[in-house]
């Protein structure tokens, strides 16, 4: 029942779902439909306004806003800190994806492209480069293929599209028309921490016209947002309520956790909404009934239950034909109505119980 306003610095709402994920992974029409639902609910979008630059939180407080949710993501790019990184042909993968998502131009770039990184974002950058005019795309990662942070499905799709993998290599320097790599002997040290070691005597040089860096993301803070932050730039907040050191400011998504999945940010949004609802009603506890550790759930993993679960291989949607493998369109089909019913029927009998802390009275029936 609260009036809600979203301030967005870009010309379109949607954040990283719109500007950070290419259409062949997530169709823009899907996000646009969801945003139309939000508008129909009465949510106001103020676009092209950067909080901290065009308007401050104090300005908004003076206008009557009582609680704030900061979900600005991790839209910066980490640096390699190697010679030649300031070369004109070097660009961050995040900036490149933002450019691609704005225009989807098949002639955006030219020549051979090198993508540095091994995560899902690096795969997106490589596949987007292939669709944007690149002749060849080389994806270079520290990890061996089986150890890459990217999901195996994403890696397989990239290989099927012709992207060339160079696994076990770390960048040494960037030249005018090429990038030099040194062999990565190990990615982690004996304690399991990220601490790559190299053999500088084994080098590989790749000729290229563009170098796209996708080795991680960083936080670009809001000017004047005087909240406590962690050494890595993420905002500190209470784990259950997502309340920051400034009592009327709540936080969620990548700016709180560092780069994670979109569903994690969505989950934070729901929890923060509950916190803000309680916050504006003075005297209400932000924490009562919300700590899941206080609920003692039956340990099903160590119980002998004589139930025959469905362990059949899951259904895989088909592929759209006739659009070309280098199309910006998502080629994955959706489930048929019959398939949806089959999957939903499985959900009804999975045996898992989820505690809704807003409704649970501790009766124990779910166990």
Where are these regions (language model features)?
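Cysteine-centered iron-sulfur cluster-binding motifs in ferredoxin-type domains/subunits
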Residues: 1, 254, 341-367
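Rossmann-like dinucleotide-binding cores of NAD(P)H-dependent redox enzymes
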Residues: 6, 10-41, 45, 126-173, ...
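Residue-level detector of alpha-helix initiation sites
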Residues: 12, 119-121, 256, 365
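Feature captures the FAD/FMN-dependent oxidoreductase FAD-binding
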Residues: 32-82, 172-180, 185-187, 210-212, ...
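Glycine-rich dinucleotide-binding loop and its adjacent helix/turn
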Residues: 36-53, 77-132, 229-246
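FAD-site-proximal beta/loop scaffold in flavoenzymes
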Residues: 86-110, 174, 189-260, 267, ...
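Mid-to-C-terminal Rossmann-like scaffold of FAD/NAD(P)H-dependent oxidoreductases
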Residues: 160-162, 170-173, 187-188, 281-349
